[in-house]
From Swiss-Prot:
Species, as recorded: Rhizobium etli (strain ATCC 51251 / DSM 11541 / JCM 21823 / NBRC 15573 / CFN 42)
Location in the cell: Cytoplasm
PANTHER family xrefs: TRANSLATION INITIATION FACTOR IF-1, CHLOROPLASTIC (PTHR33370:SF1)
Name of the protein in its database record: Translation initiation factor IF-1
GO cellular component annotations of the record: cytosol
Keywords: Cytoplasm, Initiation factor, Protein biosynthesis, RNA-binding, rRNA-binding
């Protein structure tokens, strides 16, 4: 199965939601719902409100995403 095209955007976590999901405001002023990637869960990387993150999205649904990196 070929890897599909993904879009990556930096953003800031604005709100923590239930079930390890977050509301993220992207740099282009869009707000999306994102969850943490499996490697971040596995390595127990905490994401809090106000953190700068990198969000990965598919071109099919631009309202949901996956947090792949938390900037230091």
């Amino acid at each position: 199965m070929p890897k599909e095209e993904v879009l990556e955007f930096p953003g800031i976590v604005t709100e923590l939601l239930p079930n390890a999901t977050f509301r993220v405001k992207l740099e282009n002023e869009h707000e999306i719902i994102a969850h943490t990637a499996g490697r971040m869960r596995k390595n127990r990387i905490r994401v809090l409100a106000g953190d700068k993150v990198l969000v990965e999205m598919t071109p099919y649904d631009l309202t949901k995403g996956r947090i792949t990196y938390r900037f230091k």
